[in-house]
A protein has these predicted regions:
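Outer-membrane pore/translocation modules
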Residues: 93-216, 245-259
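Outer-membrane beta-barrel "beta-signal"
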Residues: 30-32, 266-268, 293-306
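Short glycine/proline- and aromatic-enriched beta-strand/turn motifs that initiate or cap beta-hairpins
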Residues: 27-92, 97
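Cleavable N-terminal export/targeting peptides
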Residues: 1-46
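Outer-membrane beta-barrel architecture
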Residues: 73-75, 123-125, 184-188, 216-220, ...
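Outer-envelope beta-barrel architecture signal
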Residues: 41-49, 68-70, 79-81, 120, ...
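Outer membrane beta-barrel transmembrane domains
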Residues: 227-287, 297-300
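Transmembrane beta-strands of outer-membrane beta-barrel pores
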Residues: 53-59, 78-80, 87-93, 128, ...
């Protein structure tokens, strides 16, 4: 019995000593080997996910959350197809429950109600590879789970009588501004590493009476182990969706025509590899919305698992 106890204690002590004294990376590499082999064998399928933290949520130049946000995401890629989901969750109640896109003449009852901004973005893409870059054709669904759906009630002449509101149920796929989902068709071109230019064309095709159009172009420079990105984007024609609108003197027309550079920015970003599959990204952005005459500087960090 004593011999057995001695053997048990000795074996346990030796085992614990090996665990403590052996470098962590040796165990990490051994653990990752099966995963690495699996990824190599199924190289056509990739799964990426992570979470970001930002001092502000800017989307195409628009300050939507008006607060720091958590931004989880997930991406699944199979051959040329890609499915991705993004969430945006404000850390405190800063956004009006009434949609930002409609400015009421008497907003007292609605702007008094504040919520933490939330948004769910779902993308389906198809990538077309070329020698000079990649074309990506996609459809995007924008859903705001906690904001009222605001829409216009018009008379027979087309004049607006009043604004109405309803709860944004996920199964509400109505159009004409009355649904809980806005669908966008987009086409993006991304150049090669030697010429990292990108061009974006996007148009709302469902649940946006204005069928808002957005154009964007940008370029990436390498600077001292950082990426320097410069871009500019804006709307073609007035659009409530991009908060670029003003009332017309004609009662049958709610929007005047016009164009606006709503998203001009410069960003510094850098990726730090903690492990081959674990990446930490840092970004500092300076963005100007010339229509709102607003300048915003934000800092964000994203933890990526790939």
């Amino acid at each position: 019995m004593k011999t057995f106890k001695y053997l048990f204690v000795s074996t346990t002590f030796i085992g614990l000593s090996l665990i403590v004294l052996t470098p962590y990376k040796l165990f990490a590499q051994d653990i990752r080997k099966p995963q690495k082999i699996t990824m190599e064998e199924s190289s056509n399928f990739k799964l990426k996910y992570g979470v970001g933290l930002s001092t502000r949520y800017l989307w195409r130049g628009l300050d939507l959350a008006k607060a720091p946000t958590l931004e989880p995401y997930g991406i699944a890629q199979l051959n040329h197809f890609e499915l991705s989901v993004y969430g945006v969750y404000g850390l405190y109640e800063s956004a009006p429950k009434n949609p930002d896109f409609d400015r009421l003449t008497d907003p007292t009852n609605f702007f008094a109600q504040r919520i933490a901004f939330t948004e769910v973005i779902t993308n389906i893409y198809y990538n077309i590879l070329a020698k000079f870059g990649t074309f990506r054709l996609g459809i995007t669904d924008y859903h705001f789970p906690d904001q009222y759906i605001g829409y216009q009630v018009k008379d027979s002449t087309g004049a607006v009588i009043r604004y109405a509101y309803k709860i944004p149920r996920w199964l509400n796929w109505d159009g004409d501004g009355k649904g809980a989902h806005t669908l966008e068709l987009n086409l993006e071109f991304t150049g090669t590493e030697k010429f990292p230019l990108w061009l974006l064309f996007a148009i709302n095709v469902h649940n946006d009476p204005d069928n808002a159009i957005y154009l964007e172009a940008g370029y990436i420079f390498n600077l001292l182990q950082n990426k320097l990105t410069i871009w500019g984007g804006g709307t073609i024609g007035a659009s409530r969706w991009y908060q670029f609108h003003y009332e017309s003197s004609d009662p049958t027309k709610q929007l005047k025509e016009g164009n606006a550079l709503t998203n001009f920015g410069i960003a510094f970003s850098r990726e730090v590899y903690i492990e081959s599959w674990l990446i930490l990204n840092f970004s500092l952005q300076d963005v100007i919305d010339f229509y709102e005459e607003r300048n915003t500087i934000l800092f964000s960090t994203t933890l990526k698992i790939e």
